[in-house]
Amino acid sequence: WRREKPKLLISSGVFFFLPLLVSIAVLWPELGTSYQGWPIRPATFITCLGLAVSFLTFERTLVLGFRFLTTPLHQPDELEYSPQIGRRAFVLGGLGLIAAGSGAAIVRRLCQLASFSYDGTQYKGTEVQAITPNDKFYCVTKNVIDPRIDPSLWRLEVTGRIRHRQTYNLHRFKSLPAVSQETTLMCISNGLGAGLMSNALWRGVPLSTLLRAAGPLPGAAKVRLHCVDNYTDTFPLSKAMDPSTLVAYEMNGERLPDRHGFPARVVVPGYFGEKNVKWLTRIELTGADAEGFYEKQGWGPDFKIPTRSRIDVPDEWAWMSLAQMPNGIPMKGVGFAGDRGVSKVEVTVDGGKTWEQATIDYPGTKLTWVLWSYDWNPPRPGEYKLSVRATDGAGVVQRVEKARGPFSGVTGFHQVTVYVAA
């Protein structure tokens, strides 16, 4: 034992304690991440324990493997056949096959769970409906693998500058008075003609209900949201107290899909999608602002949605024939103004010299997009540039907002070029 003790101290120090401490230090901001939905503190402990077991297994495997390869089984005489090498090669080969098979199975499972198949899903084109089906709702995630939360483990905490700390399990949370509300969400990175925008009917508990039960203290000015994937974001307490700001648990009459935040996500009308956090686990009242995940990457600082509109039909560089469309060429699209509603949509086919009012086929509410259409009769064959603009509920016409900067949501007018033949 005395001879082995120095070796044990060296191997455990180099291959166990040192990498464990370095990993905890480097990964500390991420250790509260929980794939199954543990609250942040238990998740941090479980992750640290998992790292310790992993590094201990690694250290023991290295030490015992080295000892197995270097220690002779016995000392044969010159005439005796020694099968040690053959046995060891057989054992190592078998272990290698097991490791390879296990690794391949793990990779297959990870590929099945990965978000690659749906991250960046867009919703646009000829099939756009007033209410977006759940499986076609736009989706953006920071995770390679999104959480799959066990509802029995999930808790929602209300902490910070409050009088009464609150903790809800899923049953208690869903027993609170709930409302249903149609709201459109849009990603801050959505281009003028892109489809990172969708509309759904949400059901959930007003965030104000949870905050009033906790009793905000003087000095509380911001609400910081914490999610099980370690995502955080912040918005003003005044917006959190708005009756339209929800903690939603249903989407279009169904439980929230995993990719959209099951069991609870926040819906904040008028703010870009990054503020509508998914997999919510803690609501913290603070006195100061704190940068969220995407804000740290440079997005912002303005997160309120500007007035936007889009042409879905016809497509860019579409070729059409006047002879085949005697009743005119149909134009269709959407208009959206955050939480201000859309009162009017107009189109131009002459570079903005004249604007014609489109028909609003689906008016929605002040929290949703509108669907519009217009029958266009080109005066002659040729190339045309079509564009659209919307007017919000306060009468403010869509415009280029240079002061917003490139990372606070692009502004301007969506334009498509089409060619009309005789």
Segments the model singles out, each with a brief description of its role:
Residues 64-73:
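Membrane-interface capping segments at transmembrane-helix boundaries
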Residues 100-102:
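Short, glycine/alanine-rich hydrophobic alpha-helices that insert into or span membranes
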Residues 1-16, 25-49, 53-64, 106-422:
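Structured, non-membrane catalytic/scaffold regions adjacent to prosthetic-group chemistry
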Residues 77-98:
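N-terminal secretory signal peptides and thylakoid transit peptides that target proteins
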